[in-house]
């Protein structure tokens, strides 16, 4: 089965909403994303120097990597995902899908 990741950069809508953004992302949004079949895990990262976007890495383990991402778009289109009012939309988050081409270790 193909393996890959979905990589997404996001920022809070404003510095004063950052705590709400992290709470929503960690307590609600990660569960929404990983509810899609084939998206098996999620991790978030912050820049060490405090500058730049936060990133989320979603692990994909499915036959159709792009199809998993399309399921997310379909869910959003049907209104099945929580509001994105805490996300900065300029520029908008863009999911990037990468397929695994090698690995080392466990």
Language model feature labels by segment:
Residues 1-106:
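Macromolecular interaction modules
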